[in-house]
Structures are given as structure tokens and as C-alpha cells.
Amino acid sequence: MDMSGESSIKRRRSSIAASAERPAKHLRPENSTLTPGDATPANGTVYAVEDEGDAGRMMPIGPAQADSPEWQATIENVVKSVVSIHFCQTCSFDTDMSMSSQATGFVVDAERGYILTNRHVVCAGPFWGYCIFDNHEECDVRPVYRDPVHDFGILKFDPKAIRYLELTELKLRPEAARVGSEIRVVGNDAGEKLSILSGVISRLDRNAPEYGDGYCDFNTNYIQAAAAASGGSSGSPVVNIDGHAIALQAGGRADGAATDYFLPLDRPLRALQCIQRGEPVTRGTIQTQWILKPFDECRRLGLTPDWEAAVRKAAPQETSMLVAEIILPEGPADGKLEEGDVLLQVNGELLTQFIRLDDILDSSVGKPVRLLVQRGGQNVEVECEVGDLHAITPDRFVTVAGGTFHNLSYQQARLYAIATRGVYICEAAGSFKLENTLSGWIIDSVDKRPTRNLDEFIEVMRAIPDRSRVVVSYRHIRDLHTRGTGIVYIDRHWHPKMRMAVRNDGTGLWDFSDLADPVPAAAPVPRKADFIHLDGVSQAAVSDIVRSFVRVSCTMPLKLDGYPQAKKTGYGLVVDAEKGLVVVSRAIVPYDLCDINITVADSIIVTAQVVFLHPLQNYTVIQYDPSLVQAPVQSAKLSTEYIKQGQETIFVGFNQNFRIVVAKTTVTDITTVSIPANASAPRYRAINLDAVTVDTGLSGQCTNGVLIGEDGVVQALWLNYLGERTPSSHKDVEYHLGFATPALLPVTTKIQQGIIPKLRILNMESYVVQMSQARIMGVSEQWIQKVAQANPARHQLFMVRKVDCPPPQYSSTADALEEGDIILTLDGKLITRVSELDTMYDKEVLDVLIVRNGEELHLKVPTIPTEDLETDRAVVFCGAVLQKPHHAVRQQISKLHSEVYVSARSRGSPAYQYGLSPTNFITAVNGVPTPNLDSFVREVSKIPDNTYFRLRAVTFDNVPWVVTMKKNDHYFPMSEYIKDPSQPLGWLTVSHDRDRHKDGITPDQANLNPDAMDEAFEQVSDVEPDVE
């Protein structure tokens, strides 16, 4: 978009995902659906998935022309000082999301080991990275300084670690930047480690570019040139023919124009000298943004001819003056300066340049300065107290209840012209995922108590018990006119720690400390409520069924099983009010590592637990404590007869506003379907089910509901089914289909009797074949006649489409189904309906009659216990979520390479940085085989912190590869979740790094934010957008 004429500005930071040094064989492609078209439901609805970023459009880069011998000699010396920086911001902070990327820097002090690069490379938040020199020696780097405003920072490395290269440094010569000077940009352009781009300086007085909502430099001029650099060249030195660094590459245009913007080196040189002398880098501010405006604009603002003449005489080369653009409320200049004031003098000195203004303010922290401005042709002199710029730049943050908070920064305040006051959510996750937006919220109050700053927020949060629901008042920084009010559920059980992180410039790390243990949850109390009455609805059955619905909200603290979301809400149907049993879609409650809250009558909120997860048919049975609900909840009556095509029924559903809608309709079709498999990452999907569709447009708008008869008996559940992710838009398809209630009864009846069903299934997926196909494949006329008699409504048989990869103990059997087998009978019963496959649920071995290659065969096929297919353990290591391959993986793969499967990974983690992707299998650590999680945990526990190790991995498509990774226990300690019914949460949390940290580590401290995790590789940039 255009921003005051500065259109399509980009920062130069590269994504590691597109590295040219290794083909992307370790990534799972997103190609197409994997289910035959005739078995795919037709009413899929596409829902947006939060993409992590957008790489933007990059222009083609032309090579530099052949250089003169002088330039060649210069470049040969310069490249020895240039380094490629690979780095992560391990968690979101201020304007930046957690991410992994590449950039450039250059050595400015070879003796002490200082590297100059951009501030958006050094990161405002926790940084972790390393640099690679021209001879491919590698060295860890840590931040020693990042400027609060200007786009530069300084990293430090150990010069003694570089053994094979004679270190050289580039001299900073800011005064050598002149219009018309020929320059070279030497850096890691487009992630290619070393590129040399040529250009000519065209301007020295450009205002700092605006990058949009993220970090932006201001209160400095920029140098403009035509060099056509791109992502990864951030921090590159801009050198002249003498080999001196005269500017720092920072940004450029992304609209095809070969225009780049360089930061002058005056203030970086001053900061470097302060650090070399061991002095603090003082930074002063009056919280005012100034911009350069040419004399013609200044005249329109009221610059008098006398002052213009004085300025032109004192500085004949000047064509512009500094004009106040933004004065922050409650700042030193508030009420004294006004927007449009033309700056004339500071402390009696005529002043027209940013550099001198910075110099005066930086040397006057805590002291007053006198400013003379012209306002509408009148001289106005004001005195302002110079504040400390570091004091209004956050250097600490707090994580609590899954969210991350710090004081509002000067960067954000300047961008939106607001006071530098308030608590800012830089990672709106966990309890504080407000309005489904990841960041940008300012918290005004929590639990009816004001939170004007981070300290007040901490004191308020200390006192709130676990599982409390409190009122939060908030505003989004982009819309401060609108104050939102919401109720948040405080989670201090999955996220028990309230932690403070404080930046330590001495070590380059952020030091963590615990602030408060969670206050135990209050005992729940019974509450009363009444259900709504539907006015104008003539059917009495509808009024009764309202009392059988409850709203179900499921929150997942960790991404498992390829599930793409961290929170899902929908409706469930009460099947036993006395026992508190509810049936809900498995697209809402996908696994039992979660918090479930149900709302009864839109009034009473109680917790629930998972009782049963169906492995194939997309429903979950959950249970709440009915003694806490004093409301006339009614058990739904489930039909024992299957609903039929053409039958009249009443559709009762809930739309996207959670409002109940009703329509009389007709069943249009009942089709055997399988939900399409997700190509990029396997995840739970329903297979082998009869889907009911109805003749009403409401069915596509409602995710949950029922089909009922006039007598109020529920004939089918209306459920949402999670489908595939579209490769082009990276959005999830969700199907809305009916599921006949007789298929529920065998399970719900047992649960009502206190028996948890332990189903057994055939490890295969089937789909329908018509008689014309069956005859060609060898089914005899006799069997075709039997099919016609057994199922007059649908003449069909089932063919094995895919045989699942079984658990190891069931992998060797002589009698096994194969792809292409047509199933005739199970234990002597002809199979023409999906419901007839249910005979497998309680049989260890089935007598199966099939047609294979035109011949009838009798097989003794063992079934698989479904409890072996559900996830009961997860290990989080270096930001990767590892688990045993879940059922969806076994459904889509033919061979398991190991039982260490990468299910998800966190942004900004070593797993992300080094390319360990979801759907990979880890088979060995440092050459030692790791067939299961126990062996993996044992081997990686031997690896010291900050040490490289080798992982041998195999992709989902059977391609082996090796990844080298560096362990990071400080930001990503190893932790583990183990299913344990004896625990209050049903899961035991374990840390394997407790002995390395005196205060102990829990999984809550391991950056386990599901909203910052990818469960599938997305073909987009893995950093924040370069193009705004």
C-alpha cells in the first residue's frame, strides 16, 4: 500500500526456508487431495488458517558489472569482514513475532569481536544466533546493544574462536557518503551468503522509510541509492572504493524499483566508541518525531523569509529543515511543541540536521534543552526536560496464563501517537487470545482493577486463582477509540508459572525468574439456570431439544496429532443428563490433552473431561459433573432406526453467531464418504461413514445441530468434519454432514453402563464400489444378486483403498488385507452398509471373505485395539513436538520409520532454524538409533547445552536426510507430557533439564505456545512480512 508516497517498503531479512544450499526434500508437499472424488463430501466450507507471514514479491536481481582492478582489490578485503548471520527471536516481543531468519553483519572491532548489523536483526526481544565468516568458520554471537530507535545493533563474538581466518575490520567513515559516490553492497543477499551489488548514491537527505505496523526507524535521515538488494542483505556494509563502510543497508522498495535505503553511520560509530570505552550508550528523547521538509513546505507552515535566509546563509547546501511530525501525549514536549512547528535552534544553536539534534539530546539526558521553533510565522521558545530513551524501551516481559506482556514501547507509541503507558500483549495466546488476534492489545484493567503498567498488572495477576473467569478491558492499538470488554478463563494449571524475563546485556541472554505460584482454583458451586423458549416455533419437539444442547469450548495447550488450532468451540448433545454425558464432534475435541468447558443454558459453565474418542466416526464423548448444574437439562432421545433418503425431518442447528435456527426439510441423500486426507500433514479425519445431507441452506451455515422427527426423537447428529488444507490458500476445509444416531448407540449405551468401550478395528480404509466395477474386478454374479437382495436401496460393496500401517506387534501376519481387496463378508455376514462393518469392534480376529485378483479368498484377519492408536505421550525438544505416529499418520503411510514423529514445531526455535519439519521421522541421534521416544530422550539427554548434534531423519515420503542442530536449553528446555489418569489434569508434566536450572524447569517454561507452532510446513515465508 502507499504510505505518504513511500510505497512498498521492505526490510532486508531472509527466510531460511528457501535455502538454496539444500533441496526441500525434508518438507511435506501440499499437492492434492488423497481421497477419490466420489468419496469426497460436496459441501466443504473453507475456513481461514492464521498464516505466519507473507514473503511478498521479490524483484529479479541483476549481477553487478565487471569491476575495475581497484574495486576488485577492495572487495577482496571487505568480504573477510562480512558475516552471514543466522538468528532466531525466540518469542514474540514488541513489534516482532517469534521467527527464524538470516541477515548480514560486518566486523567493526576485530580485537574485541564486535559486529555491526541492523536493529531488526539483533531483535528487540530474546535473540539466539550465530555468524558464518567468509571461510565458513562459525561462531556464536550475542547482542551487546540494540538502539531503541535507529536501525542498528551490535553483536559480539569470541575472536579466539576464529582459527583459520585473519580477522579484519571495516572502518566506519560516515562523512565519506556523498551524492554520486559509487558504492558496493556486500552481504547475504536473498540468503545466498555472499552477493556483491553495485549502486550510486543519489540522496543523503531522505526521511527514514516507513515499514508499516512493525518496527520503523525515525528521527534520522537515510541515504538513497539504486542497488536492488533483497531479503537477507539487512546489515550489509555499504562500502566505497577505499574499502570503508560509509552506510548500513537497511531497506528498500518492493514494487520493482531498484531503490535501496541506507542508514548513516554517525550514530552507530558513536555507540561503538562508547562500548569500546566501556561507557553506557546514552540516548535522550523529548518524545517527538521530526521529519525533514523542504523549504517550500516550511514556508507554507509559516517559516519567515528572514529565518529562511539565515538558514540558507549558514548552511548553503541545505534544502530542508526539521519539522515536528508527532508529539507524544504525556511526553516532555507535550503542550509545548505542536505538530508543524519548524525547528530553528536548540540551546541557541541553529540546527537543520538529525545528527546534531541526536548529539545534543544524547548528551543531555536528565537535563533541560531550549528549543526555538516557528509556529505560523511566530517565534516560540520552549524548554523541555530530556528523558532517557532506554527507560521507555521495554527490556523485560512477563509470561502468565499463556500470554506474554510488557510495557508499551516507544516504538508502538510513536507509530500511533499515544502516550508510552500501558500493558501491551505481544503474544496474545492462552487465556489472553483476545478476539482471535495474536498481538496488539493494550490491557486497561483485569478483574476490575486498573493495569496502567507492567508492575500493576503483575500484582493483579498474582491474586487471581486458577480457573477463574475475570473481566478484562482492552483496546487494540490500531483502534484506540473502541474499548473491548471480555471474559477470560485464567489458566494456571497448564501454564502454572508466572515468569519474568529481564534482558541481560552482559550475557546477551534474557534471565528468567518466577514471580508467583498459582493460587489454587476455588471449589465449583452448583448454579441455577433456565433454557430459552423459542417463540414462533410451532413444533413442540424443537422446544424440548433446546434443553439437550450445551456449548463446548476446547482449549489445547499443545499441538498434537496434526490438529491445526489451539481453541475450538461448538455444540454438543446431552445423551445422559443424569450422568452428564455429551456427544460432540471430534473436530471440536480432537484429543484429551485439553481443557473442556461446557456452557449450559447460556448461563452455567462447568468443566468436562474426555471419556471416549471414536477412532473413525468423528465424535467424542465427554462428561461433566451434573451435580453442579441445577437446570432442566434433558437427555436426547436417540433413534434406533436409520434415517432414510427422502424422509421429512426437522433441522435444528446453531449458526456462526451461536443462535439456534430451525427448518423443516427433507433428506436428500445418504452417501458413504471418507473425509479427504490432508496432504501436508496427516490429522484426524472421519472415514467409512454414511453422511446424511438435507435440502436446506441452513445446513451449510450450521456447524452443529440435529435432525429430529415430529416426536422429538433425534434421527441424526449434525457435525462438523475437519478436512484438508487447500494448497493455494492454506485454508482448512470443513464439512458439515449428518451422522445417523443408531451408529452411536453401541458406544453410548456401554458408557451409560459405566463401561468404557475398547473398540477394535480393521486397519484399513474402504470406499464404495458399484456392481459394474465389482463385476469387472471378479465378483461373481451370485454375489451380485445377493447384494441386490441384501440392500435394495444401494447396490454396493466395499473395496480396501488403503491398509493402515499397523502397530509393530501387529505388523507380521500371514492373513492381511491388501489394497484393492473387495470385502464380501465379515464372519459370514454380507457387508453392503457401513454400519455392518461395526461387527469388527468387539472381535479380535475376523473371518473375512474377499475377492482379490478375481479370486475369492478366506482370511483370518486380526483387528487392532484402538487404545494403541491414541496419543499418550509427547516430548518437546528444541521447539519440536515429538510423539508416536498417531492414527492419521498410520492411515496415510505404508511404513513407519520410527516412533519418533515430528508433529509440530515452534517459531523461533532450533527446530525451525535448522529445518526439522513436521511429518519427519527421527531415526537416530549422533549415529545411535532411536526407534522410540524412550531411546530418543535417553540420547538427547546426553548432549550438552549449546552443542551441535546430528539427527538422522526420514521424510513422510521416505527420503532420508541428516540435520545438524544446536541444542538450546535456556530458551527451549526439553519437557514431556505423559498421560496419567491419576493426575488432576489426566497428564503428568515432566522436565528433563531440572538439574541444569536451579529453579527448575516445567513445560510451561519451554515456549509451549500452540499459537506459535506449525503443525505443517507452509509454503510461505517463516518470518514476519517484509512487504507491508
Curated annotation (Swiss-Prot):
SUPFAM superfamilies: PDZ domain-like, Trypsin-like serine proteases. Transmembrane segments: none annotated. Its main location: nucleus. It is found in: Nucleus. Residues 82-266 are annotated as: Serine protease. It is an enzyme of class 3 (hydrolase). CDD domains: cpPDZ1_ScNma111-like, PDZ2-4_Nma111p-like. Its EC number is 3.4.21.-. GO terms for biological process: apoptotic process; proteolysis. One of its GO terms (cellular component) is nucleus. Pfam families: PDZ_1 (PF12812), PDZ_6 (PF17820), Trypsin_2 (PF13365). Coiled coil: none annotated. The active site is at H120 (charge relay system), D151 (charge relay system), S233 (charge relay system). InterPro entries: PDZ, PDZ-like_dom, PDZ_6, PDZ_sf, Peptidase_S1_PA, Peptidase_S1C. Residues 1-45 are annotated as: Disordered. GO terms for molecular function: serine-type endopeptidase activity. Belongs to the peptidase S1C family. Nuclear serine protease which mediates apoptosis. This is Pro-apoptotic serine protease nma111. It comes from Aspergillus clavatus (strain ATCC 1007 / CBS 513.65 / DSM 816 / NCTC 3887 / NRRL 1 / QM 1276 / 107). The gene is nma111.
